[in-house]
Amino acid sequence: MKKLTALFNLPELKNDIELHNMVLDSRKVKAGDLFVAIKGHQVDGNQFIDSALHSGASAVVSETELSSEHLTVAFIRNVPVVKYYQLARHLSSLADVFYDSPSKNLTLVGVTGTNGKTTISQLLAQWAELLGHRAAVMGTIGNGLLGQIVEAKNTTGSAVEIQSSLSTFKHAGADFTSIEVSSHGLAQHRVEALHFKAAIFTNLTRDHLDYHQSMENYAAAKKRLFTELDTQIKVINADDEIGYQWLTELPDAIAVSMNADFKVGSHQWMKAINIHYHFKGADITFESSWGNGVLHSPLIGAFNVSNLLLVMTTLLSFGYPLENLLATAKSLKGVCGRMEMIQYPNKPIVIVDYAHTPDALEKALIAAREHCQGELWCIFGCGGDRDRGKRPLMAQVAEQFAEKIIVTKDNPRTEPQSQIEADIVAGFKNMEKVGIIPDRAQAIQFAIESAVENDVILIAGKGHEHYQIIGSEVVHFSDQEIALDFLK
């Protein structure tokens, strides 16, 4: 419980009020809660104050656009309503106070970048547990203690959800948490008051331009984690163009590279000298500030080499011995829907991956090629009501790296599938190796029944998701389940 005066020291509040939780959704308010009414992109929480009061809210903090109204108090049915100027921007700080600064009592690692956030955050949590910690994770797949993850709505939750979840993890015994930090979460100040032991930058490629409008805005949002927030250790992928630039601006950042010729300029660094890819993963010979060695990766694909090096570097920067990390690495496991391989005897190999940007699709196809002795198939679509500009770029990537391509549904949402397909098809030079099968299950069935034993089929775009959004309806759908049905 938290007293209202601990948040707002106001003389009008003569009788202090004990509060149970901070709640943003009026439908979830219970007796004793503080209802937070912020002006979001689609909904203004101030419209739901009456509903929250009916549900038993003990107090309300309400966003105002007038600085003159800041911390003024009105009473509705004897319930205090505190006006707060720029509430959304300061909500992380208020929630930090309300939940007793949980990130100060955890080792918190933030992971940002276009691709790799989920894999890295999951690997961090796995490795931390192998080193004796109780770890939790927050991100695209879900939130919770490792092994008890509950599905999440967004990659980065609301400022209140984040602080509340960290508090829950702490009280459940967690001492280590990795969190995916999206560009939306940074731009909307949802992680503002968190105390990061470290932050990792993976890469920056085209995504979310429907929201950010330009790559410059997108990069600026990501950069805030390293320049404006409370971040102690900065670990950056030097092979990314933006990452390399940031390393020149952040002298204390740690550089990580897969390039043996990388010229070290940072005071701490990690680089791969030789990488041997094989059917079960990769053997990575590396040099670093902490010593040299060979890391045996159980994950497939070159981009997972980068992911693993970023994770190991972060843990080395925390002081874990190199030999302990190398000994425990073999126990790491792949992440659901991230280059997830499904194999049956005498059948084509199926790989399910979340790749839904041109760069991620290219990397997934290159990784799949490592395991392909026959033809490489690519099944993909693009989400509706989202960045249309990346659709022809996805087509160009598929045409360059795959022998057979099937364009299908992803999550069309409210946009006509025919429009999405037209945008994708505009990117192909010719349609000789391209088929269009809108029904995703039929597309997967056709590929599996047409491909032969040495072929590889990459099913891209949905990964861990077990649903499709068609119109406003969410229907059950799993790439893995469909693939298994037709492989058996």
UniProtKB/Swiss-Prot annotation:
Q: Could you tell me what this protein does?
A: Catalyzes the addition of meso-diaminopimelic acid to the nucleotide precursor UDP-N-acetylmuramoyl-L-alanyl-D-glutamate (UMAG) in the biosynthesis of bacterial cell-wall peptidoglycan.
Say if the entry is tagged with keyword ATP-binding: yes
GO CC terms on record?
A: cytoplasm
State the family it belongs to: Belongs to the MurCDEF family. MurE subfamily.
A Gene Ontology annotation in the biological process aspect, one of them, is: regulation of cell shape
InterPro entries, from UniProt? Mur-like_cat_sf, Mur_ligase_C, Mur_ligase_C_dom_sf, Mur_ligase_cen, Mur_ligase_N, MurE/MurF_N, UDP-N-AcMur-Glu-dNH2Pim_ligase
N6-carboxylysine (modified residue): where?
K222
Q: Which organism is it from?
A: Haemophilus influenzae (strain 86-028NP)
The terms under GO molecular function for this entry are: ATP binding; magnesium ion binding; UDP-N-acetylmuramoylalanyl-D-glutamate-2,6-diaminopimelate ligase activity
Localization in the cell: Cytoplasm
Residues that, per the record, bind meso-2,6-diaminopimelate: R386, D410, N411, P412, R413, G461, E465
Query: Per the Swiss-Prot or TrEMBL record, what residue ranges does the short sequence motif Meso-diaminopimelate recognition motif cover?
Result: 410-413
The entry's protein name is UDP-N-acetylmuramoyl-L-alanyl-D-glutamate--2,6-diaminopimelate ligase
Q: In which pathway does it act?
A: Cell wall biogenesis; peptidoglycan biosynthesis
Whether Chloroplast counts among this entry's keywords is no
Q: Which Pfam families match?
A: Mur_ligase (PF01225), Mur_ligase_C (PF02875), Mur_ligase_M (PF08245)
* Alphabetic keyword roster: ATP-binding, Cell cycle, Cell division, Cell shape, Cell wall biogenesis/degradation, Cytoplasm, Ligase, Magnesium, Nucleotide-binding, Peptidoglycan synthesis
Binding residues for UDP-N-acetyl-alpha-D-muramoyl-L-alanyl-D-glutamate: L24, S26, H41, Q42, V43, N154, T155, T156, S182, Q188, R190
Reaction equation(s) it catalyzes: UDP-N-acetyl-alpha-D-muramoyl-L-alanyl-D-glutamate + meso-2,6-diaminopimelate + ATP = UDP-N-acetyl-alpha-D-muramoyl-L-alanyl-gamma-D-glutamyl-meso-2,6-diaminopimelate + ADP + phosphate + H(+)
Q: Could you say which enzyme class this protein belongs to?
A: ligase
